[in-house]
Design a protein with these regions (language model features):
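SAM-dependent transferase fold signal centered on methyltransferase-like domains
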Residues: 1-344
Length: 344
């Protein structure tokens, strides 16, 4: 029996994202384009096989998959729709007292007197009131027991609901804006690093980090908030609050990095082409201890073949690094993010 799901992707890479999902499942047909980098997809695979196959595939451009267990009509009136949505959620979900859970609602279209946040609060309050434990990004959870995930998608007058567990999903939790909130906002790009740390399950508490392409300082700000000593490299100025930190050293160029410097982590968000960024990171691998990690954002060009660009950069990185993971994060636009480990 065919199975439907919602696919999330960068709009410019829609065709490539659907193609890689088709490769993982054997079939994938677009039934509707919801806009904003989301589409309704149908596959010949059974529901029980869908998430297992996708979670095992090394997907690059698919940001998130939300399974659909039930779909039904809504009228746009909160006093009627919220109760109906909760009833349908309860019909397909399995969240017990003491279970950790996350409610994720997105909507496209107009004509409703309630928001996606209203839906999350209404449904989540019911589960919390019955003894289940809500999980928000502000808790900084990156490991532990599985999270029961309820996905709700509203498109005009139709609501789609799906239930899954976090280990089955490409991206288990989407509320990154509140993760590490204590760091404060310097630039939107810092949410990209926050999401990467969660996605790759990296916990850093102290240590030395090299931040390449640091200005205006969003990534450095997050890393400082984790208690790290940051060497920020960028010819441009940093945000005054970040620059004033006693745990930060600002260098104008890579040539100023001490040749005998050692770091526990390198992060690279430089706005240069993917191959150049990869070559830069290979040249700096001597600054990392064996097994230490690097996080790099590969910039892709609009209208180009993203698979070709990513594979070319990975071929260069293999000289010095093992590629642990490749992901298109929610906060990636024309780019993908890689987790690397220094060889040796």
């Amino acid at each position: 029996m065919p199975t439907k799901f919602i696919l999330y992707f960068t709009p410019d890479f829609e065709a490539y994202a659907i193609k890689e999902v088709e490769g993982a499942l054997g079939s994938a047909r677009k039934l509707a384009d919801f806009g904003g980098g989301t589409a309704l997809i149908e596959t010949d695979r059974e529901r029980k096989d869908l998430l297992f196959l996708l979670s095992k595939a090394r997907l690059i451009l698919a940001k998130h998959i939300s399974p659909i267990d039930v779909e039904f009509g809504v009228c746009g009136q909160g006093d009627k729709d919220l109760i109906s949505i909760l009833d349908h959620v309860l019909s397909v979900s399995y969240v017990l007292k003491g279970d950790r859970f996350s409610i994720q609602c997105r909507r496209r279209g107009t004509g409703s007197d309630y928001t996606s946040k209203d839906v999350e609060v209404f449904v989540g309050s019911w589960f919390e009131g019955n003894g289940s434990i809500p999980v928000f990004s502000s808790t900084g959870v990156v490991s532990g027991p599985e999270i029961k995930v309820v996905g709700i998608y509203l498109f005009n007058n139709v609501c789609y609901v799906g239930f899954s567990e976090s280990g089955e999903l490409i991206n288990e939790h989407n509320d990154e804006y509140r993760l590490y909130a204590k760091a404060g906002k310097v630039s939107r790009s810092q949410f990209k690093l926050i999401e990467a740390l969660r996605k790759f399950k990296i916990t850093m508490h102290g240590g030395r980090v090299l931040d390449l392409g640091a200005a205006p300082g969003g990534w450095s700000n997050v890393l400082l908030g984790l208690g790290m000593e940051v060497t920020a490299v960028d010819p441009a100025a940093l945000d005054p609050v970040v620059a004033a930190s006693p745990n930060l050293v600002h260098l104008a160029s890579i040539s100023e990095i001490p040749p005998d410097g050692k770091f526990d982590l390198i992060v690279d968000d430089m706005n240069i082409d993917a191959e150049s960024s990869a070559m830069m990171l290979v040249g700096l691998s001597r600054l990392l201890g064996n097994g230490s990690n690097a996080i790099i954002t590969l910039k892709l060009k609009k209208g180009s073949n993203p698979f070709k660009a990513v594979n070319s950069a990975i071929h260069i990185l293999w000289q010095s690094y093992d590629v642990v993971s490749v992901a298109s994060l929610f906060h990636n636009r024309l780019e993908v993010t890689l987790l690397l480990a220094k060889k040796g």
